[in-house]
């Protein structure tokens, strides 16, 4: 008789085998890492946190793991659209900044451009779209302009 705990341990063993076998396949690894994180399977191996599990078990940093998980989520969201999908994590990364609907819409628009499927082309396309949405000056630009004006006023008050 198999208990729930046994099934959970078997599932963890399977997920870790996926990570080991497909270390270069961002989709499979991201999917496995997401399930390990969400189901807290790492506790079964006596790890207190997902981050310590990543570091000690896979020599993987938190940010890299989360990029893989985010890329998996993008591919999972885009997969109903068609067969042409981002081929690696770097190509999927710019789309992670968008909500699910915007990801699908922008991906369709990108494919219509006929541009080569590269991380740089996708990043430029998404950045251009985000630039249209964010027409307000950035906080840094506003502070910079205010600072420059204040410095000019102070310099004008100094007489040599």
Regions found by a protein language model. Name each.
Residues 6, 27, 43, 48-51, ...:
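Compositionally biased, low-structure terminal segments
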Residues 20-98:
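Short, Lys/Arg-enriched phosphate-binding patches
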Residues 1-28, 136-138, 152:
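Short, charged, low-complexity amphipathic alpha-helix
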Residues 75-160:
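Amphipathic alpha-helical oligomerization/scaffolding segments
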């Amino acid at each position: 008789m198999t208990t729930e705990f046994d099934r959970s341990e078997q599932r963890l063993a399977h997920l870790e085998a996926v990570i080991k076998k497909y270390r270069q396949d961002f989709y499979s690894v991201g999917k496995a890492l997401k399930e390990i994180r969400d189901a807290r399977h790492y506790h079964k191996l006596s790890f207190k946190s997902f981050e310590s599990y990543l570091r000690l078990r896979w020599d993987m940093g938190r940010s890299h793991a989360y990029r893989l998980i985010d890329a998996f989520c993008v591919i999972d969201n885009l997969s109903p659209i068609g067969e042409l999908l981002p081929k690696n994590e770097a190509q999927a990364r710019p789309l992670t900044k968008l909500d699910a609907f915007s990801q699908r819409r922008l991906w369709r628009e990108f494919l219509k451009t006929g541009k080569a499927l590269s991380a740089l082309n996708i990043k430029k396309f998404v950045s251009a779209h985000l630039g249209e949405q964010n027409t307000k000056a950035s906080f840094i630009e506003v502070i910079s302009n205010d600072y420059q004006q204040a410095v000019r006023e102070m310099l004008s008050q100094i007489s040599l």
